[in-house]
């Protein structure tokens, strides 16, 4: 499909205190990001993880960076090795680090130093239920989340699961950054509607950058 807004400059949309949507911020870097997703997946394949409750997640996942987020029947944790390959996770690609760094600065988090990137692949119908990101030791560090491919509806709530939910359509190249007062806000992705993007086919990809190690 022809993108009538391909040359439009990125812009910002405030989401909550400490949170912002950076529209089209990763648009020009998208092909490099997707190429590097392919490389990471060739080393640590996508897989559907099983939660401690025995639920198989609909989203396929892999990781890169010094630490990778994983889950099994014993709980959620960050690990230095991929449990599927028993090898260290692939290094954070330069394209990932560059986009994340620029987005963090644009959102007001210039000191952010990510060491973990969770890569999510959504097929039609895949979703991510409302949750908080609280497995990290330093909750002062923000989250940087990059969207690529088929559009998805991002849900962003508050500190309680019962708080009102904002629903924001995220499109190819959009980035959401949240920290500060909103760092522990509940968030998720509604079931992905069937669609097509010329760079990703039926899929949506998401890169979620976090600081997962203890700062010295």
UniProtKB/Swiss-Prot annotation:
It is an enzyme of class 1 (oxidoreductase). One of its GO terms (cellular component) is cytoplasm. Substrate binds at residues 69, 76-78, 135, 161. Fe cation binds at residues 131, 133, 187. InterPro entries: Alkb (IPR004574), AlkB-like (IPR027450), AlkB-like_sf (IPR037151), Oxoglu/Fe-dep_dioxygenase_dom (IPR005123). It catalyses: a methylated nucleobase within DNA + 2-oxoglutarate + O2 = a nucleobase within DNA + formaldehyde + succinate + CO2. Residues 113-213 form the Fe2OG dioxygenase domain. Binds 1 Fe(2+) ion per subunit. 2-oxoglutarate binds at residues 120-122, 204-210. Keywords: Dioxygenase, DNA damage, DNA repair, Iron, Metal-binding, Oxidoreductase. Dioxygenase that repairs alkylated DNA and RNA containing 3-methylcytosine or 1-methyladenine by oxidative demethylation. Has highest activity towards 3-methylcytosine. Has lower activity towards alkylated DNA containing ethenoadenine, and no detectable activity towards 1-methylguanine or 3-methylthymine. Accepts double-stranded and single-stranded substrates. Requires molecular oxygen, alpha-ketoglutarate and iron. Provides extensive resistance to alkylating agents such as MMS and DMS (SN2 agents), but not to MMNG and MNU (SN1 agents). Belongs to the alkB family. PANTHER family: ALKYLATED DNA REPAIR PROTEIN ALKB-RELATED (PTHR16557), NUCLEIC ACID DIOXYGENASE ALKBH1 (PTHR16557:SF2). This is Alpha-ketoglutarate-dependent dioxygenase AlkB.
């Amino acid at each position: 499909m022809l993108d009538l807004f391909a040359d439009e400059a990125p812009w910002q949309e405030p989401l909550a205190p400490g949170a912002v949507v950076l529209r089209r911020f990763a648009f020009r870097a998208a092909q490099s990001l997707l190429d590097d997703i392919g490389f990471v997946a060739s080393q640590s394949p996508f897989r559907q993880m099983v939660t401690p409750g025995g639920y198989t997640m609909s989203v396929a996942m892999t990781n890169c960076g010094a630490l990778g987020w994983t889950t099994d029947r014993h709980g959620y944790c960050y690990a230095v090795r991929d449990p599927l390959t028993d090898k260290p996770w692939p290094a954070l690609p330069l394209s990932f680090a560059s986009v994340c760094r620029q987005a963090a600065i644009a959102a007001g988090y210039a000191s952010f130093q990510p060491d973990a990137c969770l890569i999510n692949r959504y097929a039609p119908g895949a979703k991510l239920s409302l949750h908080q990101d609280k497995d990290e030791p330093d909750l002062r560090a923000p989250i940087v989340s990059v969207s690529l491919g088929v559009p998805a509806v991002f849900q962003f709530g508050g500190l309680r699961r019962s708080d009102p939910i904002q629903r924001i359509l995220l499109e190819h190249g959009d980035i959401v950054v949240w920290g500060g007062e909103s760092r522990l806000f509940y968030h998720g992705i509604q079931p992905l509607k069937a669609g097509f993007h010329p760079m990703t086919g039926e899929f949506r990809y998401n890169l979620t950058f976090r600081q997962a190690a203890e700062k010295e």
